[in-house]
């Protein structure tokens, strides 16, 4: 199956998932109000970052190892799932202490919200594992179905749970959706392998956990560390502005900024549609022409979206959130450009990981994260939420340029 066809499958699921994600946030914005929605937006990047770091960083490593195997034996990957669960429990325990690092308005939030965030980390393990296997098998059609099921469940659950449990209910709906998607993902693995996936071994905790720290598992874990650090840093990088705004300015302005930030992130559905199948294919072929093909596809997919955000920013703001705050409009224009540069870096990062240079990708995004934190702390204090968007734009351009330089240097060695 070609990269283009794989990308179309992922794009279609991402279009659906992004649409459902907008519906998820629309429902929470409608039910919670701007300030409570701002608190949710301030917690979501924390939940996502911890989920990636303690759980979802391993699946790309699984995909790489699996894609390089001549004879596939899925059952030997089962102990990895238990290792992921163990790491996620550590993340759950550490979550309540995050507020002391974030400070500001985060200190005023009840602990139950932080426990809800921790629950998201634990619940994500099964769906993350199944996606790693499906990606490694190059079953992109099945992989795309896991997103569809997850987001469908999330939207169904969020309305009821948010209505009765508020912000806690919104976070709980995410955990339950992870579980539903994870169980469905295991079924898809069984279907893809035509019954060769041993469910008995999956639930045989006693024997499976004996191999949890095998050399094979540790090799995957070691490879996943820079990927997990890169991905979690990348996620934190993308929303450090919202976190700083929440900490310094509180829930209301975090909500206003969150509206614009959420819409601008729509560009990433195009980039992820290309980057997900790009990693295992470059890992197999070491062909950088695939990166060029991916960049062209991303440009075609993203151009209309960016133009719309630049010239008609008030339309999506009013359509989705019934508000068009002047600061929010300006932020959306700036963030659309920023997201375009970061979408290109998403492809560059996947190429670096596929070529075995995951550490370089991590160093680049770590530099970007530190720069973004510094700029946000300065500019948010000086210019409010507009300062947050300017800080993100400056950092995005810097990260993109460094990524291009790294790829050009590596290309010389390959040639």
Curated annotation (Swiss-Prot):
Keyword Transmembrane helix among record annotations: yes
Alphabetical UniProt keywords: Cell membrane, Membrane, Transmembrane, Transmembrane helix
Localization terms from the record: Cell membrane
Membrane spanning stretches: 20-40, 43-63, 78-98, 109-129, 155-175, 243-263, 300-320, 328-348, 360-380, 388-408
Superkingdom as given in the UniProt entry: Archaea
Chief site of localization: membrane
Cellular-component GO terms for this entry: plasma membrane
Short name of one Pfam family: Polysacc_synt
Protein topology in the membrane: Multi-pass membrane protein
Classification via PANTHER family: POLYSACCHARIDE BIOSYNTHESIS PROTEIN, PST FAMILY PREDICTED COLANIC ACID TRANSPORTER
Family: Belongs to the polysaccharide synthase family.
Protein name: Uncharacterized membrane protein MJ1375
Species the sequence originates in: Methanocaldococcus jannaschii (strain ATCC 43067 / DSM 2661 / JAL-1 / JCM 10045 / NBRC 100440) (Methanococcus jannaschii)
């Amino acid at each position: 199956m070609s990269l283009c066809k794989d990308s179309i499958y992922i794009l279609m699921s991402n279009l659906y998932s992004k649409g459902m994600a907008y519906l998820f946030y629309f429902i929470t914005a409608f039910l919670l109000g701007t300030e409570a929605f701002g608190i949710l937006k301030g917690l979501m990047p924390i939940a996502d970052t911890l989920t990636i770091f303690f759980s979802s960083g391993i699946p790309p490593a699984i995909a790489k190892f699996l894609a390089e195997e001549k004879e596939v034996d899925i059952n030997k990957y089962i102990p990895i799932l238990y290792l992921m669960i163990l790491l996620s429990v550590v993340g759950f325990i550490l979550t309540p202490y995050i507020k002391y690092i974030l400070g500001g308005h985060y200190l005023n939030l009840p602990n139950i919200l932080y426990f809800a965030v921790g629950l998201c980390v634990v619940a994500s393990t099964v769906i993350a594992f199944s996606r790693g296997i499906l990606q490694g098998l190059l079953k992109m059609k099945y992989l795309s179905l896991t997103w569809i099921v997850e987001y469908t469940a999330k939207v169904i659950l969020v309305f009821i749970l948010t209505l009765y449990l508020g912000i806690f209910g919104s976070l709980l709906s995410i955990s339950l959706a992870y579980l539903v998607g994870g169980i469905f993902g295991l079924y898809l693995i069984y279907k893809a392998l035509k019954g060769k996936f041993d469910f008995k071994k999956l639930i045989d905790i006693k024997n499976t956990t004996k191999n949890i720290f095998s050399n094979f598992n540790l090799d995957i874990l070691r490879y996943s560390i820079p990927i997990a650090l890169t991905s979690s840093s990348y996620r934190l990088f993308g929303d450090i502005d919202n976190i700083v705004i929440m900490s310094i300015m509180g829930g209301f302005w975090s909500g206003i900024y969150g509206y614009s930030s959420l819409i601008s992130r729509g560009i990433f559905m195009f980039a992820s549609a290309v980057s997900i199948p790009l990693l295992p294919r470059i890992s197999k072929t070491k062909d950088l022409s695939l990166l060029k093909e991916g960049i062209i596809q991303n440009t075609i997919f993203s151009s209309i979206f960016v133009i719309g955000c630049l010239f008609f920013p008030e339309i999506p703001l009013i359509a989705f959130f019934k508000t068009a705050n002047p600061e929010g409009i300006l932020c959306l224009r700036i963030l659309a450009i920023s997201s375009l540069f970061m979408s290109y870096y998403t492809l560059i990062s996947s190429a670096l990981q596929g070529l075995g240079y995951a550490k370089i990708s991590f160093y680049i995004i770590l530099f970007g994260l530190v720069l973004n934190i510094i700029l946000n702390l300065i500019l948010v204090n000086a210019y409010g939420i507009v300062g947050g968007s300017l800080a993100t734009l400056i950092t995005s351009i810097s990260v993109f340029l460094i990524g291009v330089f790294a790829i050009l240097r590596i290309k010389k060695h390959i040639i």
